[in-house]
């Protein structure tokens, strides 16, 4: 007798052709996908596919929430209002007309472009505090651009310095955020370690950076002067 063949109805294995992500927007399918992620039955490709589908499904709601929180922060957040005032004094203008909430396809929180303004990745915002940190981060970029005429494209030292500044001043390296969200459990020199680590990651992502060692070297070259610079604040605010 021929050897028995596996049943066509048996549970499929995760492979290059089956990444473990089930298509569908219904609640049952979504919970099955979440369970597959939690139990390790979904590949990295499948997890990304699940996240993209979720982001597309929630795009309108994510952008609306982001815009509402953006407008609230522009009106009521002390750090955002302070940065807005200092940017305005340098001849710039950042407000709801050029701070955009959009769905992003790459995993980042936001970005700054001198010609267009600030992008906030609505699908990556965890809560209003995260959005406030991201806005402050990018507004420090805008302040640096107006005050120091930063060469974003070619000068890695300029890029490294502004990354150190904005990461240190925006609040994203607060102890609680590092401890509870990122699993960084240092009690001494935590702020400095966080700023340097995240600045190196940002510089590493730039096209003119060769590798991580190159990024680390550039950040170390500008570290002493740039970490001490707290403009437009008198001291590290958050």
UniProtKB/Swiss-Prot annotation:
Any one Pfam family match given in the protein's UniProt record, by short name: Peptidase_M76
Binding site for a divalent metal cation: 137, 141
InterPro entries listed in its UniProt record: Peptidase_M76_ATP23 (IPR019165)
Subcellular compartments: Mitochondrion inner membrane
Membrane topology: Peripheral membrane protein
EC id: 3.4.24.-
Keyword tags: Hydrolase, Membrane, Metal-binding, Metalloprotease, Mitochondrion, Mitochondrion inner membrane, Protease
Gene Ontology CC, one term: mitochondrial inner membrane
Residues that span the membrane, as ranges: none
Active site: 138
An annotated Gene Ontology molecular function: metalloendopeptidase activity
Gene Ontology BP term (one): mitochondrial protein processing
PANTHER family: MITOCHONDRIAL INNER MEMBRANE PROTEASE, MITOCHONDRIAL INNER MEMBRANE PROTEASE ATP23 HOMOLOG
Family classification: Belongs to the peptidase M76 family.
Stated role: Has a dual role in the assembly of mitochondrial ATPase. Acts as a protease that removes N-terminal residues of mitochondrial ATPase CF(0) subunit 6 at the intermembrane space side. Also involved in the correct assembly of the membrane-embedded ATPase CF(0) particle, probably mediating association of subunit 6 with the subunit 9 ring.
Protein name stated in the entry: Mitochondrial inner membrane protease atp23
Source organism of the structure: Aspergillus oryzae (strain ATCC 42149 / RIB 40) (Yellow koji mold)
UniProt gene name: atp23
């Amino acid at each position: 007798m021929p050897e028995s063949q596996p049943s066509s109805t048996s549970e499929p294995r995760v492979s290059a052709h089956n990444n473990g992500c089930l298509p569908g927007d219904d609640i049952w399918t979504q919970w099955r996908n979440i369970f597959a992620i939690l139990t390790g039955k979904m590949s990295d490709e499948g997890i990304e596919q699940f996240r993209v589908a979720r982001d597309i499904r929630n795009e309108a709601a994510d952008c609306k929430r982001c815009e509402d929180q953006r407008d609230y922060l522009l009106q009521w957040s002390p750090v955002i209002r302070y940065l807005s005032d200092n940017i305005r004094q340098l001849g710039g203008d950042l407000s709801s007309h050029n701070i955009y909430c959009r769905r992003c396809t790459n995993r980042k929180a936001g970005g700054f472009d001198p010609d267009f303004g600030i992008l906030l990745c609505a699908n990556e915002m965890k809560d209003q505090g995260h959005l406030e940190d991201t806005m402050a981060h990018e507004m420090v970029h805008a302040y640096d651009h107006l005050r120091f005429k930063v060469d974003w494209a070619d000068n890695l030292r300029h890029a490294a310095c502004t990354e150190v500044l904005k990461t240190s001043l925006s609040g994203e390296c607060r102890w609680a955020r590092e401890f509870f969200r990122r699993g960084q459990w240092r009690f001494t020199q935590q702020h400095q370690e966080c700023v340097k680590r995240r600045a190196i990651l940002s510089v590493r992502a730039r096209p003119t950076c060769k590798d991580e060692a190159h990024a680390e070297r550039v950040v170390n070259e500008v570290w002493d002067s740039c970490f001490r610079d707290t403009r437009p604040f008198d001291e590290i605010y958050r």
